[in-house]
């Protein structure tokens, strides 16, 4: 789209992919935030540009958070969205279905799968929500955008180090910071290189708030006054004084 627009200098806005990191600090109430983190990662079975693609959890709450996320994953019914009780539907197409299965195998090789990981037999591109622990930043599952129901949970012990790790990506669409101390979380959020950083929530997009990515996650903004301004051009009328 950008290349096609270049020849005639058309202005464009681009909202592209992301590898959103969730940074979970050491003072969180794990039982309170785990369902929100799960929903932030697995909404539409992970097929949302601003879904949480990787979680960094402080070592002091790491095991508890992994256990909570694993339980939520095991409880989430996957199937036909028209059927009562279904929480998560299928992958959108076979290409993405096969791609996500590949990421599951990456997770199996590089970490430990604690929930999901097995693709059911039968028709449909159904993959259960999969939680992977004991994995590091060099795995493809962490470095790339999986766009599907596979969530790596990575351990950290130093906040400055994890900010650097979260920023070590070509993407910059969204991200979130989770803490019982919002002032502390805000200071962390200021250092994360993304177009939007949520505190104690994720993927909360509102029509009056501008949204857009940085780095390879996009150009310009949509929504809000800034989004409307993308479709306007500044005009100056300069009149000589008598």
List each model region and its residues.
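ALDH superfamily catalytic-core signature
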Residues: 1-136, 199
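Conserved C-terminal structural/oligomerization subdomain of aldehyde/semialdehyde dehydrogenase
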Residues: 23, 77-78, 104, 119, ...
């Amino acid at each position: 789209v950008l290349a096609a627009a270049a020849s005639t200098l058309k202005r464009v806005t681009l909202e592209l992919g992301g590898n959103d990191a969730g940074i979970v600090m050491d003072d969180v109430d794990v039982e309170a935030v785990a369902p929100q983190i799960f929903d932030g990662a697995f909404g539409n079975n992970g097929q949302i540009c601003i879904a949480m693609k990787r979680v960094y959890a402080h070592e002091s709450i790491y095991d508890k958070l992994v256990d909570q996320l694993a339980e939520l994953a095991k409880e989430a019914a996957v199937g036909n969205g028209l059927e009562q009780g279904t929480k998560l539907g299928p992958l959108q197409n076979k290409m993405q279905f096969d791609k996500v299965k590949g990421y599951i195998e990456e997770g199996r090789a590089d970490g430990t799968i604690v929930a999901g990981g097995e693709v059911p037999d039968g028709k449909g591109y159904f993959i259960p929500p999969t939680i992977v622990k004991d994995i590091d930043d060099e795995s493809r599952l962490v470095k790339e955008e999986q766009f599907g129901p596979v969530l790596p949970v990575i351990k950290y012990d130093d906040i400055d180090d994890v900010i650097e790790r979260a920023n070590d990506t070509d993407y910059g669409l969204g991200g979130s910071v989770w803490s019982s101390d919002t002032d502390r979380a805000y200071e962390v959020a200021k250092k994360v290189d993304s177009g939007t950083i949520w505190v104690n929530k994720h993927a909360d997009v509102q029509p009056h708030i501008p949204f857009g990515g940085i780095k390879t996650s996009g150009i310009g903004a949509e929504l809000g006054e800034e989004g409307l301004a993308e479709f306007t051009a500044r005009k100056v009328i300069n009149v000589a004084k008598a």
